[in-house]
Amino acid sequence: EERVLDRKNGIDRRVQYAYDAAGNVLKQAILGTDGECLESSTRYDLKDRATHRTNPAGGVTRYLYDRNDRLRKEISPYGYEPESDDGAGVSYTYDSRGNRLRTTNALGEVVQELSYNLRNQPVIQKDTFGNRTELSYELDGKIKDVRRSGNHQRTLQQYEYNARGQITGVVDGNRNPISYDVDSWGRITGIGFVDGVKEGYEYTPAGQVSRTIDGNGNAVQYRYNSLGKISERIDQLGFTETFRYDEEGNLSLHIDRDGRRLQRACNVFGQPVYEKATDAEGKHTNISTWHYDSLGRVTRAVCDGKSYEYIYDAYGNLKEKRSNGKRLVSYTHDRAGQITEIMDPAGVSTRYEYDILGRRSRIYNNDGLEVRYGYDALNRISRIHYGNGVETAYTYDGDGNIRTLETKAGENVLLS
């Protein structure tokens, strides 16, 4: 059992574990003093491989392995079928040396294919759209260059190293060289760009950045406390920004370059319980406070005279947000912990649906408003379809940038 106790702020969280004979964690229960219990569990096979993980809401993630103990399939709560103890999930295939060759998502779409050299380093990466990335290596195994092959073959990155194996230069996809100066510890002391601009860095004996110099010669200085945290930052004009910390290392005071102060007190988890902001003269005070339950979840926040309350369901998800006792918004979640319904103060409900990969596929309400989302195999939005018939379609280039965007209403093109 583990216990986190902060009597001053009402936190008393206990975590209990149950183990099998092999030392594997079977159950984890997070307990609060108000009767809260968030329990998750894990099942193992005879080879001590995790086969089922169940979250507090009962959602099951299933893992299946090949005869060489490699993960061959991972099924999310959206794809898991208890009746068959199986379902649609992400599948992996390997070569005889254990290198992952192919990743296929739960819809059967090939996400990525890999090829390796004799050193088991990936030399070719290919996605479902045929975009092919090739990598070459130095004799010591460091990446030499990265190339994109296909209709427009080009080099994406080239790397140069010194005798110690430290990067001293990079040539980007536009053939712009960037040079790096390094000290005997391998720390970057200068960066030179193709236009002649150079940036510089200096360090403390402990290896922290003590001074930076931008391309215009402007310097920013940094000072640190005994714990290695920044205590002062002196900008290019000589103005000082001050930082102070409590005994746990949490920021307790921040004074900006104009003298504005922010005082803060935190609980045992580093979460703020009190903040006081003032101007340089100590006026125009703004105080905020936060209250937490025994598990460390925020239950009340007060700022500018407004009070907000937070209520959670039995599985630890945010259920309701209130202001001065009035409900602002309420939430419903599925077994995977994703929001399925949001209800506003007027009782208007907005619902959310997800596909088998856990991607948001539909948003709708009782007034007939609806939006549907489609995705490609790389989890990028490929289309957005609105209830009024308007649809926006997206295509992407080999670097993942949007190549085309077209909005249509029926056969009429509205935007392209």
Model-based region annotation:
Residues E1-D172, N176-F193, V197-D214, N218-D235, ...:
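Beta-strand elements of repeat-based all-beta scaffolds
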